[in-house]
Amino acid sequence: VVTLDPAAALAGKLYNRKDISYFITHPCHPSIFNWEPEEEKMKDHFGGNLAKQAIVCSLLQGSEEDYALGEAIARKFYAPVWKAHRITTEQMGLLEPALVETLASTCVFVISEGLKEVIKRGVPAEAARDFLLGHLRIQMAVLFNELPGAVFSDAANKALRRGLNEFIKDDWRKIFEPDNVKEQIIAIT
């Protein structure tokens, strides 16, 4: 049996049968740092069509042969795939929902709301969007080491610290605790 994310497995919603194998996979989607030579490929934001992407794979139960078959199926299903990462089902739950939905989607949503706010306060929409998206690109490149050795300016670091103190709770990492991850999964399944 192939499932397309870890939620059902981690919520205990898969039948407990020892006579079948469970393989879990999910696309990483094309990275924001992915580069494709053709514009049409660059616009394949979800992946599984034209743009290359990585995938994550887990064998919940079964043999190594079952894993190999599952990965081969996943590579075809999500093609073009440039890399398959083998991780545990629990690690996949840390990635989704905790990292990419609960944390990243929330942060990106707040950023998009900030864009709407500066537009509401009079900044021309096109200028605000161009300014934000350009800065997001360089911020992501610095923070994710796409520009080795690059750092934020002193002023940018001061603004970052101020933002962390103003609207990020000190205990935000609790979303990665096993019980919290399970609560997230139960809430969405």
Spans of model-derived segments:
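NAD(P)-dependent Rossmann-like dehydrogenase/reductase catalytic/cofactor-binding core
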Residues: 50-54, 120-189
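General structural feature for long, well-ordered alpha-helical segments within catalytic domains
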Residues: 66-70, 110, 128, 132-135
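A short glycine-threonine-serine/GTX helix/turn-capping micro-motif
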Residues: 96-105
